[in-house]
Amino acid sequence: MRMVSIASGSSGNCIYIGSDSTHLLVDAGISNKRIQQGLNEIGLTGNDVNGILITHEHSDHIKGLGVLSRKYEIPIYGTRETLDEIAAAGSLGKFDKGLLTPVCPDLDFMVGDLTVKPFKIDHDAANPVAYRVQNGEKSVAVATDMGHFDQYIICLLYTSPSPRDTERSRMPSSA
């Protein structure tokens, strides 16, 4: 599994997560041109993307969503409230609302060979989520714009330590 930050920050967010056969974007908050450049740098194009996971509806997370969706007809995943806000926004232009796929926090779903778990986060948006993506034993999580995090989120982000990490935790620390 591979994760690449195409863009991150207040000017726009777009993260690539993928396996050998399934390719996802988390957010599309930069121009379609910049997304294409980022994908090209890792040997992909928009045609390779199997889904876009939207964390919330703020412009720095959806700026390129309309163009990307229209051009490549990529399914868009997000909470019902987030998708309703996106569909109501005139700034995205016309796009196929049939590509909008609602997800529920804490209910896993599959995109290709990747298991995706959305989970609630604290942010001033319409039911925002972060995502944990798993492929076999490997997983990665993307949690943006969090006001704070609690024990529940820590548990979701935690993965079983490797045997090496477990062995290290048994060793006395050097002073």
Give the label of every model feature segment.
Residues 35, 65-68, 86, 153, ...:
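Hydrophobic packing residues within well-ordered alpha-helices of enzyme cores
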Residues 148-157:
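Short amphipathic alpha-helices and their capping/turn segments at secondary-structure boundaries
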Residues 1-42, 128-145:
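Conserved beta-strand hairpin/beta-sheet module of binuclear metal-dependent hydrolase folds
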Residues 32-78:
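Active-site metal-binding motif and surrounding structural segment of the metallo-beta-lactamase
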Residues 80-130, 134-137:
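Metallo-beta-lactamase
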